Amino acid sequence: MRLFVGLGNPGSKYQDNRHNIGFMVIDEIARRHGFSPWRRRFQGETADGSLDGERITLLKPLTYMNESGRAVQEAVSFYKIGHGEVAVFHDEIELPPAKLRVKVGGGIAGHNGLRSISAHIGNDYLRVRLGVGHPGVKELVHGHVLGDFAKSERPWVAALAEAVADNAGLIAKGREATFANKVHLALQARGFLDDDNKKSGADKAAK
C-alpha cells in the first residue's frame, strides 16, 4: 500500500495557483485510473484505487499548505506505513516549467508544505518535484506561486498532469527513474521540453 499526497491550498480562490499543481496532478491520477469518489478523512480528502496492481490512497490535505504534515501524519499512522511508502507531489520553483525531478529525502528548499510534512514524519519520503519556474527574484516568489497559471501555461500543465498520471504506476512499483524518464519523453514529444532537456515550451513561447 502506498500513500500519494498532492500539495495545495483548499478552495476555489487557490485552485488554479501554481502552488496547487500537486492537487491538479493527484486529481488527474484519480480521474484516469477510476479511483473512488473523494471523501473527507485525515484533515483532507482521500480517494482509493490501484495502480499496476498496487493499492494506492490519494490524499489532498485541506489544512492549507503550511499545515500539510498534520494530514499526512494522520494517514501514515492510520495505515501503519513507513515513510518509504509516501510520495509527495509538489510545485518546485527551482525547476523550469514542465520539468520534473524525483528524489527521496533531502532539503525542503523553502517549501512550507514539505517543511510541515518533514516536521511530522521525517525526511525520508519520496518527493515528485513539479517545475513551475522561478520569477527571477526572491521578492516575487510568494506572488508567483500563489498566482494562477497563465492561459498560455495551461497546455503544458495539462500535459504534465496527464503524463504523471499515465506513468504513476511506476512509482507504485518503485521504478522512480523510469517514471521520470517516461514523463520527460512524453512532454518532449508534445513539444513542451527541448531535446537538450533544459528548456520548456513555455520558456520558448515567452521569448
From Swiss-Prot:
- Tell me the keywords, alphabetical order: Cytoplasm, Hydrolase, RNA-binding, tRNA-binding
Q: What is its main location?
A: cytoplasm
* Residues under site feature: Stabilizes the basic form of H active site to accept a proton: D91
Location(s), subcellular = Cytoplasm
A single GO CC term, please? cytoplasm
List the residues marked with site Discriminates between blocked and unblocked aminoacyl-tRNA: N9
Pfam families, alphabetically? Answer: Pept_tRNA_hydro
**Catalytic residues in the record:** H19 (proton acceptor)
Q: How does it assemble?
A: Monomer.
Q: What is this protein called?
A: Peptidyl-tRNA hydrolase
